[in-house]
């Protein structure tokens, strides 16, 4: 079994992206699944293209994407991706689409196909705060989640896919008073727990 895990490069003036720091620290084999890791650019469309290329290359059983949600205090497992880009800030090459469909011929939205409630419950058993989120936003995180699910759906692929948002790392909030953060160790444990659930359910 293969699980493709994606993370983003830094964006929005940050020097690091916790999703990539987590990705680098994941084990290479979890619950008997080979973990294939890829960093993707925080760029509309290009991020999706990079992941689709990797899907074609490695033919994974599941794809789990991780992204930063600065301001959230817990691990948030996304329920749904919507067919819209509405960027509050530019992406990493200056694109800032407003009220733009991701795929004019695509479905209005797609639900995650990973077991979101079980993932949340298992993460909480590790004494790490977690919840289901009903919005992945309208920036590149939602864009990537939608793009992957859209590709899987249109091509009739038997690949589970979903997205998990994680908080800032403590080092990112040194000058952001009252902004929540989470330790790298807890975030790695949370994502590895999510992967264990996905691996069990994908067999």
From Swiss-Prot:
Coarse class of the protein's main subcellular location: cytoplasm
GO cellular component: cytosol
Enzyme class: hydrolase
Compartments, as annotated in UniProt: Cytoplasm
Source superkingdom: Bacteria
Catalytic center residues: 78, 141, 165
Catalytic activity: Release of an N-terminal pyroglutamyl group from a polypeptide, the second amino acid generally not being Pro
Keyword entries, A-Z: Cytoplasm, Hydrolase, Protease, Thiol protease
EC number(s) recorded for this UniProt protein: 3.4.19.3
GO terms, molecular function: pyroglutamyl-peptidase activity
GO biological process: proteolysis
Function of the molecule: Removes 5-oxoproline from various penultimate amino acid residues except L-proline.
Complex formation: Homotetramer.
Family indicated by similarity: Belongs to the peptidase C15 family.
Protein name in UniProt: Pyrrolidone-carboxylate peptidase
Organism listed in the record: Thermoanaerobacter pseudethanolicus (strain ATCC 33223 / 39E)
Gene that this sequence comes from: pcp
């Amino acid at each position: 079994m293969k699980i493709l895990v994606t993370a983003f490069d830094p964006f929005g003036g940050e020097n690091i992206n916790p999703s990539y720091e987590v990705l680098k620290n994941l084990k290479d084999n979890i619950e008997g699944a080979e973990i294939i890791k890829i960093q993707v650019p925080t760029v509309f469309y290009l991020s999706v293209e990079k992941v689709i290329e990797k899907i074609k290359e490695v033919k994974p059983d599941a794809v789990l994407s991780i992204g930063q949600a600065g301001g959230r205090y817990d691990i948030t497992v996304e329920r749904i991706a919507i067919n819209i880009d509405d960027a509050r800030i530019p992406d990493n090459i200056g694109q800032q689409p407003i009220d733009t469909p991701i795929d004019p011929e695509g479905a209005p939205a797609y639900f995650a196909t990973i077991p979101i409630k079980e993932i949340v419950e298992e993460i909480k058993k590790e004494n790490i705060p977690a919840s289901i989120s009903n919005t992945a936003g309208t920036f590149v995180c939602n864009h990537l989640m939608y793009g992957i699910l859209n590709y899987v759906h249109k091509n009739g692929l038997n690949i589970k896919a979903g997205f998990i948002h994680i908080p800032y790392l403590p080092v990112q909030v040194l000058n952001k008073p009252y902004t929540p953060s989470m330790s790298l160790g807890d975030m790695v444990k949370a994502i590895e727990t999510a992967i264990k659930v996905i691996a069990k359910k994908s067999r």
